[in-house]
C-alpha cells in the first residue's frame, strides 16, 4: 500500500558571384511564413558526461558541452502553449555514445526542458485516477508490476542483438531518463522497469481497456465508446499530391500538448526510423493520438475501436505475462519498420488487447507525384481486439476511391464481429462502417481536398446544427455536436436525450489537427492546429463552458489559435525511395 500511495502521490554550392555584380548586390530580408514555427525562440540544454565521473551525466543550459565529445544529447524547447496551444520539442542524440546512454540522455533532456508541462499534464490526467478507486488501483498496480517484471525478464533472456527486445530496453532507458531528470535525481544512465507517474502517462490509451478488464467503475462524463479520432488519406487529382491527416478527440483535460522530433544517433541500417516526428504530450514517448512520421518514409495514425463484447475482457485474452502494451509496440514499430507491412506485422507481436485500434500506415516511398500508384504496399491497415489481430493491404481501396478514412469503426468483417460492432450497427447507423456521420461526410467531401489548406478545412469541419448527417432523434435539439469530423461534445445540451449515449453532452471534443502533404513529408514536417474546432462554432473557452470539474492546469482559457507549420531546426533526412530487397 505504501508503494501504491507513493505511485499516485508523486508528481515530467552557391554559384561563384560575377565580379561586375559585386557593388549591385544588397541583402534581401528573409520573410517567414506567419504560421511557421521557425519564428519561435528556444531554450537549449546539453546532456554531458561528467568530467570527473563518467558514470554520471550533467545538464548544461547551452548548445555545447565544454568537452564536445562528452555531449550525449541536445534538447531544444519552445513553450508556445499560450500562443499556439503547443510546446515544440527537439531532441538529438549523438552516435559517439552507446544506444543505452543515448536513449537515457534523450529522456534527460526532455524531462528537464518540459518539467512544468509534465507536471501540469500529470495533474490533469493522472493525479486523481485512484480517487474513490482504491481497490481498482490495487489490482492495477499488481497487474502492471507483473507485466514490467515479465518484460524485464525477456530483455535479460533474449540476446542484445534481438531488435524487438533491444528496443524495449531502450524505450525504458529513455523513460528512466525523463523520470530521473523530472524528479531531479542523480543522472546515472540506468534502465528502470519501474512503476511511477511518468510510466502511467505512457499508458493513457491502454488504460481504456485495462479499466474494463480490472473492473473500474465507469465515470459517466467519460466518453463511453472510444470515438477518439478521425484519420484520412487522400490522393490529389491526377496524383499530383498525397495527404495524410488526423484529428485527436478526447477529454479537454488532455490539451497540454507538445510537438516533437526525436533524432537518435543510431545506425540507420539497424533502426531505419531513427528519426520520428509526432504530435504528443509532455513526458510521453509516443504520440498516443496517434500521428507519427518516421525517417523510413512512413506515417502511422490510428483511431480507436470500442470493444462491446465484454467476454473479451478476461485473462484468456489479456494477461500481464506474454504481452506488451500498445504504447511500446507502436514505438518499436515506428523505429524498426521500413515498410507498411513490416509496421503492421511488428505491431501485432505480443498483442495485449489494450488500446484496440485501427492503424493506418502510409508508405510515402511508393508515391511519385503525377505517377500511378503501385498495386500494393502503399497503404496498410491493422485492427486489434483482445485475442485477435488482422492486417490488410488497402492500396486497392486508395487507388479505386482516391481516399481512405478512419473513424473508430472496424473495416475488417471479423474484427467487426468479434468486437460487437456488427450487432451495434444493426441497431444504429452511428456504428456502421460507411454509414456513420463521419463516414458519410468524408465520402461527400473528400473530393474538395486539393491542397494543405483544403485538407485543414475538412479535418476541422463541424457545422452540426446545419449538417444533415449530424441530425438525430434527440431532444431538445435534433442534432449532435459529435456529428462532425472534429467533435464538439461539449456543445451538446446537458440533460438532453440522445439516441446513443456517445451523441450526448460529454467532456469530449476534437483537440487538434495534424496534416501533411508530400513536400512537407520530405522534411518530416506537418501542420498542427491546437484546440477544438471553431468557425462557425464558438471558440472553446474554459470560462464559458457547461463542463465542470474538468482539470485544465496550465492551459490557456481561450482556444482561438490558428495553425502552425512546423519547420524543425534539426536536419531530418527521410527515405524517399523504396528500400532494396
Swiss-Prot record:
EC nos: 3.1.1.-
GO cellular component, one term: extracellular region
Sample GO molecular function, one term: phospholipase activity
Residue positions the entry lists as glycosylated: 50, 82, 132, 169, 215, 309, 543, 546, 560
GO biological process: phospholipid catabolic process
Source organism, top-level taxon: Eukaryota
Subcellular location: Secreted
UniProt key word Glycoprotein: yes
UniProt xrefs under InterPro entries: PLipase_B-like
Keywords in alphabetical order: Glycoprotein, Hydrolase, Lipid degradation, Lipid metabolism, Secreted, Signal
Enzyme class: hydrolase
Signal peptide: 1-16
Major location category of this protein: secreted
Function as written in the Swiss-Prot or TrEMBL entry: Putative phospholipase.
Family affiliation: Belongs to the phospholipase B-like family.
Protein name: Putative phospholipase B-like 3
Organism of derivation: Caenorhabditis elegans
UniProt lineage: Eukaryota, Metazoa, Ecdysozoa, Nematoda, Chromadorea
